[in-house]
Design a protein with these regions (language model features):
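Compact, glycine-rich, soluble single-domain proteins
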Residues: 1-77
């Protein structure tokens, strides 16, 4: 099942399937490590600051919550 990254909870893992953002945002997300096939772990969701923190490979990346709705993922069991 493919769903937006925003649905992932803290501690859950997923594989990036598709990014449905505009080209400039997609490029920025790609530079941050959000690429097709990458496995990531949700480390923190902070609704007050509207930030989400993910671990991708050995990197820890924070992105705006709005972008997590444009990254489609498949949960890992």
């Amino acid at each position: 099942v493919v769903e937006p990254l925003s649905g992932l909870g803290e501690g859950e893992m997923a594989e990036v399937v598709w990014i449905i953002s505009e080209a400039d945002v997609r490029e920025m997300l790609g530079r941050s490590g959000f690429l097709y096939g990458e496995v990531l772990t949700c480390l923190l969701k902070n609704p007050v600051r509207q930030l989400c923190v993910y671990k991708i490979r050995r990197r820890v990346v924070a992105i705006r919550e709005e972008y997590t709705k444009e990254i489609l993922v498949r949960r890992m069991l």
